[in-house]
Amino acid sequence: MGQELCAKTVQPGCSCYHCSEGGEAHSCRRSQPETTEAAFKLTDLKEASCSMTSFHPRGLQAARAQKFKSKRPRSNSDCFQEEDLRQGFQWRKSLPFGAASSYLNLEKLGEGSYATVYKGISRINGQLVALKVISMNAEEGVPFTAIREASLLKGLKHANIVLLHDIIHTKETLTFVFEYMHTDLAQYMSQHPGGLHPHNVRLFMFQLLRGLAYIHHQHVLHRDLKPQNLLISHLGELKLADFGLARAKSIPSQTYSSEVVTLWYRPPDALLGATEYSSELDIWGAGCIFIEMFQGQPLFPGVSNILEQLEKIWEVLGVPTEDTWPGVSKLPNYNPEWFPLPTPRSLHVVWNRLGRVPEAEDLASQMLKGFPRDRVSAQEALVHDYFSALPSQLYQLPDEESLFTVSGVRLKPEMCDLLASYQKGHHPAQFSKCW
């Protein structure tokens, strides 16, 4: 995360996990029943007696904030400058967690519907952090979605899930302290237009599915997968973020709202108004992101309403019938006047780069099934032949261990980086970092 991870009010189309809350209610602990939602209180979060004034430094604090403010360019490739920042910062191990005075605000990153995000540094250990500051309404208090997100994230510990370090509660604000990430997948793709290196797509996709398999095993649905909600470190670690719409799920399904997931990544069953769904909801979004990484552009963009979104999907998958999708005609938004045309098309015909990578089209087709029960699970997708080129050690990693701890696992330079290198007369071997 960094200057590249802005709120959607700052850069249209960007909704990084700190800045894009504001969905409907969502539950927070596995399969906890809806009737217990009122049981969540602010006391479930860590309370602190210190004020939040230190997040708006004045005087000496302001001078320190300016001194340690990162000057990293938009490419976010210079992680060494941040290391210099940490080495020059005098931290105090005696400072407590849960106190606003333990963190120093460096710069504002963005602002969302009810949260403002700052890049900060921990005065406890010198680590860079992201400070998500939520102002509490005098009448309504903390947005309930924030309480749910915090409660959920405190129970999810995985290398491909963004880490919540600390929670600070005062009378005026609630602050989430997250690990600092350098960028998100949307920004990474915009910095490398025309599609990503096939090797990098494979690594990113493996990490995405690994994170999904974990949360689905914990009975949690993300419900808002999109590139902006997938954070990337300077090494290339991909992490699921923005659990503002996430909620616990029952097995196999439960009645929820159909108004979930950004429109471009919303599956046809949700578009048709289905309120009973399970983990296959996230699988559709992951499949859309999978192909988008190859193609360099969204699969079904530019639509403004549900009907147009469905029409774009039907152009590829064909219009569903009771034979291909049992029960589809009973869904609220199903239109009986739709004609059973066009016929389904091969994915590689629509998105040509899929056909250039062995097994990529087969995996994508298993994720983008119209009938939700036909979609592959995240755990099944991880053992698909598409990933056979990756080291077998990846499957033995503990949940909290990164892929990049395995020898030889690293991102390759993207094509635009290689071209820029040759234009400058440099050799590709000089790439010491992932981008």
From Swiss-Prot:
The keyword Isomerase does not apply. GO terms for cellular component: cytoplasm; cytosol; nucleus. It comes from Homo sapiens (Human). PANTHER family: CELL DIVISION PROTEIN KINASE, CYCLIN-DEPENDENT KINASE 15. GO terms for biological process: regulation of cell cycle phase transition. It comes from the Eukaryota. The active site is at 224 (proton acceptor). Keywords: ATP-binding, Kinase, Magnesium, Metal-binding, Nucleotide-binding, Serine/threonine-protein kinase, Transferase. Pfam families: Pkinase. It catalyses: L-seryl-[protein] + ATP = O-phospho-L-seryl-[protein] + ADP + H(+); L-threonyl-[protein] + ATP = O-phospho-L-threonyl-[protein] + ADP + H(+). This is Cyclin-dependent kinase 15. One of its GO terms (molecular function) is cyclin binding. The keyword Nucleotide-binding applies. ATP binds at residues 109-117, 132. Its cofactor is Mg(2+). Residues 103-387 form the Protein kinase domain.
